[in-house]
Amino acid sequence: MITFCIPSKNNLRYLKSCIRSIQQNSHYTNNILVFVDQDEDGTVQWLLDNDIAHITNPDKDCKGIGYGYDAMFKASKTDLVVAFHADMILGPDADKYLVQEHTRGSVVSATRIEPPLHPPGPEKIVKDFGMWPEDIKWEDFNAFAKAQSKANEGRLGKTSFAPWLIDRRDHLGHDPIFLSVFEDADLFRRFVLAEYTMIQSWSSLVYHLTCRGGQFAGAEKLEDFQKKDEKWLYSNQVSMLEYVRKWGGMFKEFGPCEPRPNVKYNIGAEVLNCTEDVLSLEPFLDQLKVDCSYTNYLNTQEGKSSFNIKDKFVNNLTTDIVIKLDAASDGSLEYFNYILSNIEDTMQQVDQFSTYEFGPIQIAVGKKEPVAIKITIHDTDL
């Protein structure tokens, strides 16, 4: 037996079909647990009426999907838990195939079948079984999923994406700096750092209505998919910068949805004739020594970051690696941006305790040791 853990934020319309699919298509007699982050659509009452176990957000502010999963994993009465989304429909026996591939120290993801809203990819199947929960072609989907499961039995990949199954004793905890965007990118890369086995089962299938609680939240008609939710776009931008601050760069992949941890270095920059464009690269840096005012930049970041950005600005750099540039020199900003965006490749070209010039940029390398990323995060408030 496993526990399907489903975060919900005013997702009752989708949650009904999601839970129906788990109840009808599970191979095992499984538990269902819902984390209600926000309820303005009668979610809690419906769960009570249908005797579905749930946890409610204790605060008025939304906690986010990561907090929800951590809370549900802790409350689960089974060790095997599945991180599921409210806009997903479970395929026949999908749970059996997840369990079949699982061992301690592994994370097993199902394969998504999606309607044609996003570009196709080698890690998923694009096929339309309905765009809305009320229009799901249940018989067609179940028949297709059964046939695909049989045809792909034993076929495995390395993609990581919800839904994913794990023994809750192996869970590393979500980082609270990522509210509901990039939280999985961060977690999956820590799974890889912990040397977990990342598995995708092509026999375990779900139909994913695609981001109805995120970038397409509130979509009511097809035209709504032409524009992403404004709140999601804002959260995505904020979380992207937080990811860069933590990991040292944008997230990387070995293949589509195959997480590759970043290699972060301790980097500072000394900048003459500093500009706002230079300051905007702050997320890539641990320290900055500049000759311009950075008050306005700090104001633009206020309340958006869990990092102490103000303390990054110093009079003397103490980082392992120091980059020096004159922002007034031709091409310096382009070189600076390129070096920071490709820092792992740059570090492959240099030796420690050496100085190098890349165009108008000077790099002084002291220690060339990666920064250790904290792998396990547990919220003691849960």
Language model features with spans:
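A recurrent flexible, glycine/aromatic-enriched loop bordering the glycosyltransferase active site
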Residues: 141-166, 180, 230
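Short beta-strand-to-loop acidic/aromatic patch adjacent to the donor-nucleotide binding site
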Residues: 78-91, 320-328
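Conserved donor NDP-sugar-binding/catalytic core segment of glycosyltransferases
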Residues: 89, 93-132
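A conserved hydrophobic helix/loop-capping motif in glycosyltransferases and polysaccharide synthases
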Residues: 2-14, 18, 25-26, 268-274
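A conserved acidic beta->alpha catalytic loop
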Residues: 35-45, 292-298
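A short, conserved alpha-helix in the catalytic core of glycosyltransferases
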Residues: 157-164, 170, 178-205, 210
